[in-house]
C-alpha cells in the first residue's frame, strides 16, 4: 500500500493498494503518486513546492518513479537506509491502519481490500479527530483555517 500524507493536517491525499508490491511494477506506485499530485492541483496548490519523502525502496529510487516529478514543483526526500524513524508520521499512519483492520473495522464485511482501504481513508480524513489538530479531523482543520 502506498500512502501520501499531507503532514500539515494528517490528511491522506493519495493512496493505492494492490495484492502485491511488485504485481504491476512501478504502475502501483505511480497511480498513488499521480492521485496525490492531481489532488494538489485541485486544491489550488500547483505552484507551491511539495516535499515527497519516502524510504529508499527500489521503486522510490527508480528513474521511472522520479520522472513523474519533472512537471511538478516537488522536492524529493529519502530516509536513510534502514531508518524508518526518519519518516515517523507515515510509519505511525501505517501502524494505525493495520490496527484499525482488526479493531474498528471488520475486514470480513468487505468484498475487496480496495473498498476497505477507501473506507479507512475516508474515516481518517473526515471523522477521526486528532490531538495534534486540536481534536479536529484533517478536513475540518484545514477548512477552518481557510484552505481547500
Predicted regions mapped to residue ranges:
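Acidic/histidine-rich, metal-coordinating catalytic segments
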Residues: 45-60, 84, 137-139
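Surface/interface recognition patches
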Residues: 19, 31, 44-46, 61-77
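C-terminal domain-tail junction helix/linker
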Residues: 66, 70-74, 96-148
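Active-site beta-loop-alpha junctions of metal-dependent nucleic acid enzymes
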Residues: 16-44
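Hydrophobic "anchor" residues
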Residues: 9-15
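RNase H-like polynucleotidyl transferase catalytic core
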Residues: 52-56, 70-89, 105-110
Amino acid at each position: 500500500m502506498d500512502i501520501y500524507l499531507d503532514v500539515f493536517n494528517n490528511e491522506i491525499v493519495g493512496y493505492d493498494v494492490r495484492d502485491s508490491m511488485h504485481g504491476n511494477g512501478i504502475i502501483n506506485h505511480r497511480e498513488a503518486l499521480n492521485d496525490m499530485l492531481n489532488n494538489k492541483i485541485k486544491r489550488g496548490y500547483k505552484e507551491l513546492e511539495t516535499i515527497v519523502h519516502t524510504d529508499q525502496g527500489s521503486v522510490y529510487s527508480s528513474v521511472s518513479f522520479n520522472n513523474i516529478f519533472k512537471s511538478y514543483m516537488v522536492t524529493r526526500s529519502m530516509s536513510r537506509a534502514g531508518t524508518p524513524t526518519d519518516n515517523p508520521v507515515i510509519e505511525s499512519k501505517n501502524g494505525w491502519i493495520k490496527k484499525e483492520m482488526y479493531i474498528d473495522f471488520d475486514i470480513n464485511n468487505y468484498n475487496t481490500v480496495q473498498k476497505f482501504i477507501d473506507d479507512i481513508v475516508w474515516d481518517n480524513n473526515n471523522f477521526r479527530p486528532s490531538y495534534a489538530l486540536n481534536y479536529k479531523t484533517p478536513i475540518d482543520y484545514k477548512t477552518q483555517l481557510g484552505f481547500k
